[in-house]
């Protein structure tokens, strides 16, 4: 978490190997990121994604193209995508697209799942459902979430990395409230 401009997106780009650190090293699964070649262990759901440039088919076609057939069924049921399967991805709402992008990331059964603003574009019912899904999938994998939704973070995070303070800090649940007040100047 952190205010705009604190470096949240930059941190994600570093974790995903899109940027190289100017100083220090980043390790993923015990390997320095420049030597890391097991990207299938990482699932990523961007905040915004323009799939229409290369995909005009249905949600079902997209899922089957990306995933092995046996993996798709549980994901469709788990995310309640049944009513979206025959629809074109480009004609879905932003929230519906977000759910499909999460499904695509889960087809890899990643050890690390990185989500950039996963609640963007979701109505309250969809937010509650995605929050439940994230609780379930985080039981057997590491989930990194960038979010401006502080209530979501405080309800779900086991640790919070606070950017935009005098120094970057890892915070545990008992201190969340105090750090949020400091970070956003609330008293």
Where do the model's predicted regions map?
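Conserved ABC transporter NBD signature motif
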Residues: 24-38
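Hydrophobic anchor residue at the start of the ABC signature
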Residues: 102-103
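Conserved ABC ATPase signature
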Residues: 88-92
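Conserved beta-strand-loop-alpha-helix hinge in the C-terminal portion
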Residues: 163-187
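Conserved ABC ATPase "signature" region
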Residues: 70-86
């Amino acid at each position: 978490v952190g205010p705009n401009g604190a470096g949240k997106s930059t941190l994600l780009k570093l974790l995903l190997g899109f940027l190289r650190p100017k100083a220090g090293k980043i390790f993923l699964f015990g390997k320095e990121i420049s030597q890391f070649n097991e990207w299938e262990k990482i699932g990523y759901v961007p905040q915004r994604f323009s799939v229409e440039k290369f995909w005009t088919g249905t949600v079902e076609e997209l899922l089957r193209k990306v995933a092995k057939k046996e993996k798709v069924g549980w994901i469709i049921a788990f995310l309640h995508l049944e009513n979206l399967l025959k629809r074109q991805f480009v004609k879905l709402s932003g929230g519906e697209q977000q759910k499909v992008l999460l499904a695509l990331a889960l087809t890899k059964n990643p050890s690390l799942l990185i989500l950039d603003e996963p609640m963007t574009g979701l109505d309250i019912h969809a937010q509650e459902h995605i929050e439940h899904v994230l609780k379930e999938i985080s039981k057997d994998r590491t989930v990194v979430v960038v979010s401006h939704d502080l209530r979501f973070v405080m309800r779900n995070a086991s640790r919070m990395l606070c950017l935009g303070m005098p120094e970057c800090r890892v915070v545990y649940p008992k201190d969340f409230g105090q750090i949020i007040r400091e970070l956003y100047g609330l008293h």
